[in-house]
């Protein structure tokens, strides 16, 4: 019996916080074979790093089956954690790690998938990153206006 190949998904994500901490938003795009799904959300009191990470978590939660996922982000915090730091954080039981609640949520959301992070320079003309930034900023502004 031949094992079926996993779908290759690209997850673009960005986060924004007005005040850091302050109202914040995240925006993301899931891409598969040319199809795109945008998503966004936010919180009343948060930081940019929390929103960067929430954007990835929420995107992973939208996937309905195990996939190979490339996370594309302008957050070196998120990309380096995914690719380099997370295993040692787990071994050290997250001692001295910020946003432990979200990293544990990330681990749960990422568990069925193979996830790798790719860093892109922010505000550098990368269309998907620019769109995610727009979604995140719009959500942060919407939340700020509602307070």
Swiss-Prot record:
The keyword Metal-binding applies. SUPFAM superfamilies: Ribonuclease H-like (SSF53098). Keywords: Cytoplasm, Endonuclease, Hydrolase, Magnesium, Metal-binding, Nuclease. InterPro entries: RNase_H (IPR050092), RNaseH-like_sf (IPR012337), RNaseH_domain (IPR002156), RNaseH_sf (IPR036397), RNaseHI (IPR022892). Monomer. Endonuclease that specifically degrades the RNA of RNA-DNA hybrids. This is Ribonuclease H.
């Amino acid at each position: 019996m031949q094992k079926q190949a996993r779908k290759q998904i690209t997850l673009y994500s960005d986060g924004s916080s007005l005040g850091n901490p302050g109202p914040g938003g995240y925006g993301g795009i899931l891409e598969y074979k040319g199809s795109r799904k945008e998503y966004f959300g936010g919180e009343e009191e948060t930081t940019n790093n929390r929103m960067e990470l929430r954007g990835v978590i929420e995107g992973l939660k939208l996937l309905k089956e195990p996939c190979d996922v490339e996370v594309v982000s302008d957050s070196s915090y998120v990309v380096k954690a995914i690719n380099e730091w997370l295993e040692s954080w787990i071994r050290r039981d997250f001692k001295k790690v910020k946003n432990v609640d979200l990293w544990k949520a990330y681990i749960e959301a990422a568990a069925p998938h193979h996830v790798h992070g790719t860093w892109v320079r922010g505000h550098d003309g990368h269309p998907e990153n620019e769109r995610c930034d727009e979604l995140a900023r719009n959500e942060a502004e919407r939340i700020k206006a509602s307070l």
